[in-house]
Design a protein with these regions (language model features):
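Acidic-and-aromatic substrate-binding clefts and catalytic sites of carbohydrate-active enzymes
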Residues: 31-32, 53-65, 87-97, 124-128, ...
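A short helix->loop->beta-strand "cap" motif at the edges of active sites that frequently abuts
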Residues: 77, 113-114, 152, 241-245
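A cross-domain feature marking catalytic cores of carbohydrate-active enzymes
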Residues: 7-11, 53-55, 81-86, 118-120, ...
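N-terminal pre-domain/capping segments
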Residues: 1-109, 141, 148, 152, ...
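Charged helix-capping and loop-helix junction motifs
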Residues: 64-68, 96-102, 129-140, 167-168, ...
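Active-site groove signature of glycoside hydrolases
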Residues: 108-129, 248
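Acidic/histidine-rich catalytic cores of soluble enzymes
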Residues: 4, 50-51, 141-228
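A structural motif
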Residues: 45-48, 113, 206, 243-244
Length: 275
């Protein structure tokens, strides 16, 4: 199995959207409101090789991507992936959403990233309408085209609160798109799925994986060494398949982010062939 390990920098501050995005769809980038220098130092100290960041955190360095790359290299890290997203089902705003995704992809490529990950597929107040999955699928194909233009691999990240929560909903999405699949183990399990089984089912789309722990009651995301989600079957599937892509550990919040990163790294050392 892969020995390439990354960590998402989202744990080092609260998640929000760029404030300009309140009145401008094209500017609604994700942002971790935290100190990325500290995040990168901690991620390196915990033993990871690369990072994933939100598109808005990369946008902060749009005038000098070289500075961002130096910030990473100072800690012996590289940028692996950038995360973005969209509603993807409302034709009137789609071009503005893709202005943002195009910007994110261009900056990601300039910063040396390999992957572009997107979430989304809005759930309407009145529920999913006929044609919404087709619209989402077409938009995700467009994401894949944008990513390819910039030399990136594109992946869809099924997520709670979107049109792709349950295994059946995920199948419905993938019936309408050719984009890759970035499984997030916690989101898949929390929606009633079996992460290992879903990775096996859609393995031909999987070249990048998010590992995250999950606690059922009270609901919480956790380091992967605790909670109610046993990730050993997921690692077994990846190992049996000879997976050689990157694995990113993700954790949305933890009181001590460095402690959480170290705990997950130690668990991986104990339970997988990752060293």
């Amino acid at each position: 199995m892969s020995e390439k390990l990354a960590y998402h920098a989202n744990c080092w501050g609260p998640l929000g959207g760029h404030p300009v995005g309140v009145t401008s769809v094209k500017d609604l980038f994700y942002v971790t409101f935290g100190d990325m220098r500290r995040a990168f130092a901690d991620i390196a100290a915990a033993g990871y090789q690369a990072v994933e960041v939100f598109d808005g955190n990369l946008l902060e360095h749009a005038g000098d991507i070289g500075q961002f790359r130096r910030l990473l290299s100072d800690h012996g890290l590289s940028l692996l992936s950038v995360y973005s997203g969209g509603n993807f089902i409302y034709p009137d705003i789609l071009d503005d959403e893709f202005w943002r995704i195009e910007k994110a992809a261009a900056l990601a490529a300039e910063a040396g990233a390999v992957h572009l990950v997107v979430g989304g597929g809005a759930k309407r107040a009145g529920g999913v309408r006929d044609g919404d999955y087709e619209r989402l699928g077409a938009a995700l194909d467009r994401v894949a085209d944008v990513a390819a233009k910039h030399g990136l691999s594109a992946h869809y990240h099924p997520h709670l609160t979107t049109m792709a929560e349950t295994p059946d909903e995920i199948r419905h999405v993938f019936a309408h798109t050719r984009i890759g699949f970035c499984p997030d183990t916690a989101h898949l399990a929390a929606a009633g799925g079996d992460p290992a089984a879903l990775i096996e089912e859609h393995y031909d789309r999987v070249t990048y994986v998010h590992l995250k722990g999950w606690q059922r009651d009270p609901f919480a995301f956790t380091p992967i060494d605790r909670g109610d989600l046993d990730l050993r079957p997921t690692l077994e599937v990846l190992d049996a398949r000879g997976f050689d892509g990157w694995i990113a550990v993700e954790l949305d919040f933890w009181p001590d982010p460095l402690d959480g990163a170290r705990a997950s790294r130690a668990w991986l050392q104990q339970h997988s062939k990752v060293s």
